[in-house]
Amino acid sequence: MLTLICVNTCTAQTPKWDGQTVRDVPYKQVADRPLLMDLYLPEERRSDKSPVIYYVHGGGWAAGNKKKFGSTLMLPVFRQLAEHGFVCVSVSYRLCRKGQGVRMRDCVTDVKDGLRFLKRHAERYAIDPNRVVVFGDSAGGQLAQMLAYAAPEDFAGDPDLAATTIRPCAGISWYGPSDFTDVALFETGLSDRKPDRFGNRITGDEGGYQTNPKAFEEMSPYYWIQKDSPPMLLLQGDADATIPLAHAIHLKEKANRIGANVEMMIVKNAGHNWRRAGGAPTPSVPEIQRITSEYALRQVSP
């Protein structure tokens, strides 16, 4: 986990942005703590109501923050989309840190409330709530899948936002897990990590799937996807030892069975965070970034 956390936090920085930025916008209050999001506006608007890319950072549900938007891995995607008039949003959420009582369900609820906040204030920020693409990496990929697949009214958190519903028009997941109920999906000969190491993020204790199967199912996008779910793009490395390729294949196979719109791209020679694994990643990282932005653009085009 240390490597995963370091990659997700150490490369983050405040990006240079050509358009206007609106930082540290409080979208909800939890106890005495505000949860914040940043909005990066395009230099040139293409319409009165701009499409949105809503970014959810990774970090194992226990690390990271909205500043990962400015990492060298992510920023090119957002700059490409801003050139086409997208408003780019990066959201922070509560983290599953020891002793704080936060569970993965709280992470889902927070990022859901962030979307509800944007819908509530769509006129203020001149955005189109019907053209919102959700995007995340690793843990953020799972959260993006949950945003796309769970019903708009599910995972209500802030009572002031609960009546506001929003359904993303599409989602993009970079190496996000799809099913916590099947430990075999986390097993790989590439790592000696414990396959069920994320269970305590779901339940708050060391009990596995057998002790609380409903909680594990609830956090698994695999159990939420339906035929009419928003389109989803899955990008996954074939040598990922953190979130194995099996997760993307597993979700794609179910999508094929039920007729849901899921596209999958396997990146060869790529580990987690597109780290090189035995050769040059194919497609390359710049190509992955371009594929990601072009997919989002297609989903909001007439």
Where are these regions (language model features)?
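N-terminal cap/lid segment of alpha/beta-hydrolase-fold proteins
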Residues: Q13-D48
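Mobile cap/lid helix-loop segments that gate and shape the active-site cleft of serine hydrolases
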Residues: T14, V30, D182-W224, P230
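Short beta-strand element of the alpha/beta-hydrolase
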Residues: D48-G60
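Catalytic nucleophile-loop/oxyanion-hole region of alpha/beta-hydrolase
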Residues: F69-L73, V77-F78, H84, V89-P129, ...
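Primarily recognizes the serine-hydrolase "nucleophile elbow" in alpha/beta-hydrolase
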Residues: D113-E187
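Short beta-strand/loop motif that positions the catalytic acidic residue
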Residues: D228, L234-Q236, D240
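Conserved alpha/beta-hydrolase "acid-adjacent" motif
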Residues: A241-H250
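Catalytic active-site module of serine/aspartate enzymes centered on a nucleophile-bearing elbow/loop
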Residues: P281-P302
